[in-house]
Amino acid sequence: EESLGTFKVELIKSRYHTISEERIGLELFNLICVLCSTFLPERVDFDDLYHETIKCIEGKHSIKEKLRRYVEWELQLLTSLGFGLDLDKCVVSGSKGDLKFVSPKSGCAVSSKSSVGWEKKLLVLPEFLGNRKSVNISSIADLENGFKLTEYFIRKNLNPVKGFQIDHFF
């Protein structure tokens, strides 16, 4: 017993009260925990994902803002695991403006000019993502498009990781 070390731990900052104030905060934190425990390998550092997680759960924000931050967190999860999306320029033309869609095959943004005739096969790029980042979320539809985008790529890229049904998450 005398050769065992001891730890003295002092809580510097508690995030529990921020998370537990509203139901949505607890639900989002639960989703974060489930996705991390399911898909992240052990003993690997994910500094960017850690900082995005803190950004997602900290602070008092509106429900829309919390959901927007969660969509950004899911994108960081995909990036951390090597399945990041390129939402900064059009995969077809290389232009950085007027990005409206995301290709389900490449995970890259597509401009409205380059997407003519293909709109039904592409995923909608929400205004708050990509190079059109906006602080304010204009509509619930924009958030829904964000969730559809991340859901598609999580199902496509992460489902085979553990070999189980991911349907119950969505």
Predicted features by range, described:
Residues E1-F170:
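Non-catalytic alpha-helical scaffolds and adjoining flexible linkers that form interface surfaces
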